Amino acid sequence: MINKKSSNETRQKRHLRIRKHVIGTPDRPRLNVFRSNTAIYVQIINDETHNTLTSANTKELKVGANIEGAAALGKAVAEQALKLGITKVVFDRGGYLYHGRIKALADAARAAGLEF
């Protein structure tokens, strides 16, 4: 019998393929996104030192994990990054399609001043 892989397994494989090409540096750290059913988590990571420079999630902001919450999260993480002097990042969509909540987060981060 042929076993169908779950969508999360295929997303994880897609994310590994993306991570081969998306690398954060001290000049342009990586903006990583993880999306669950209940929350969205964002980290800005320097991959050379393996340090998380800043992070945010929808649970801390007390907003939902919907498109409006993703936009608020994008704005919040961009403000945190600008306080640290980070203006340019590399966007890592985490294997998710660039659509819906992921797109709303990215658009809000760009509007708040991050460049990617």
Curated annotation (Swiss-Prot):
<dbReference type="GO" id="GO:0008097">
    <property type="term" value="F:5S rRNA binding"/>
</dbReference>
<dbReference type="InterPro" id="IPR005484">
    <property type="entry name" value="Ribosomal_uL18_bac/euk"/>
</dbReference>
<keyword id="KW-0699">rRNA-binding</keyword>
<dbReference type="GO" id="GO:0006412">
    <property type="term" value="P:translation"/>
</dbReference>
<protein>
    <recommendedName>
        <fullName>Large ribosomal subunit protein uL18</fullName>
    </recommendedName>
</protein>
<comment type="function">
    <text>This is one of the proteins that bind and probably mediate the attachment of the 5S RNA into the large ribosomal subunit, where it forms part of the central protuberance.</text>
</comment>
<dbReference type="GO" id="GO:1990904">
    <property type="term" value="C:ribonucleoprotein complex"/>
</dbReference>
<keyword id="KW-0694">RNA-binding</keyword>
<comment type="subunit">
    <text>Part of the 50S ribosomal subunit; part of the 5S rRNA/L5/L18/L25 subcomplex. Contacts the 5S and 23S rRNAs.</text>
</comment>
<dbReference type="GO" id="GO:0005737">
    <property type="term" value="C:cytoplasm"/>
</dbReference>
<dbReference type="InterPro" id="IPR004389">
    <property type="entry name" value="Ribosomal_uL18_bac-type"/>
</dbReference>
<dbReference type="GO" id="GO:0003735">
    <property type="term" value="F:structural constituent of ribosome"/>
</dbReference>
<dbReference type="GO" id="GO:0005840">
    <property type="term" value="C:ribosome"/>
</dbReference>
<dbReference type="Pfam" id="PF00861">
    <property type="entry name" value="Ribosomal_L18p"/>
</dbReference>
<comment type="similarity">
    <text>Belongs to the universal ribosomal protein uL18 family.</text>
</comment>
<keyword id="KW-0687">Ribonucleoprotein</keyword>
<keyword id="KW-0689">Ribosomal protein</keyword>
